[in-house]
């Protein structure tokens, strides 16, 4: 019984640690998505005849406005997919942690 309780407790602690990591990752992805959305919004105001430059390491390279917009769209779609996958992981670990806590509570009640 003691061994089972320690395994459940380890699972709960592991899930809580994973939750914290996932929450940080979600926040970072949401921040990057917000930056991409703002960049796209700014590019909407830019005329087709204006020069657009993209970062290439420490340099900037002149790019086609359409390709920059396409790149931003692809980046935003990828970020949204990543956020969705992380949210699924978050839900899984929240459920796992909750179930582990419930099992620990039942074990404590059965011992008492």
UniProtKB/Swiss-Prot annotation:
The keyword Protein biosynthesis does not apply. It comes from Schizosaccharomyces pombe (strain 972 / ATCC 24843) (Fission yeast). It comes from the Eukaryota. Keywords: Chaperone. PANTHER family: PREFOLDIN SUBUNIT 1, PREFOLDIN SUBUNIT 1-RELATED. Binds specifically to cytosolic chaperonin (c-CPN) and transfers target proteins to it. Binds to nascent polypeptide chain and promotes folding in an environment in which there are many competing pathways for nonnative proteins. Gene3D superfamilies: 1.10.287.370. Disulfide bonds: none annotated. Pfam families: Prefoldin_2 (PF01920). Heterohexamer of two PFD-alpha type and four PFD-beta type subunits. GO terms for biological process: protein folding; tubulin complex assembly. This is Probable prefoldin subunit 1. One of its GO terms (molecular function) is unfolded protein binding. Belongs to the prefoldin subunit beta family. The keyword Chaperone applies. GO terms for cellular component: cytoplasm; cytosol; nucleus; prefoldin complex. Coiled coil: none annotated. The lineage of its organism: Eukaryota, Fungi, Dikarya, Ascomycota, Taphrinomycotina.
């Amino acid at each position: 019984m003691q061994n089972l309780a320690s395994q459940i407790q380890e699972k709960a602690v592991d899930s809580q640690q994973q939750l914290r990591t996932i929450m940080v990752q979600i926040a970072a992805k949401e921040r990057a998505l917000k930056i991409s959305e703002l960049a796209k919004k700014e590019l909407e105001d830019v005329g087709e005849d204006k020069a657009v430059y993209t970062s290439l390491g420490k340099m900037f390279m002149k790019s086609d406005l359409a390709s920059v917009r396409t790149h931003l769209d692809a980046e935003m779609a990828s970020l949204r997919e990543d956020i969705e996958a992380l949210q699924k992981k978050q839900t899984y670990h929240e459920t796992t942690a909750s179930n582990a806590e419930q099992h620990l509570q039942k074990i404590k009640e059965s011992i008492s």
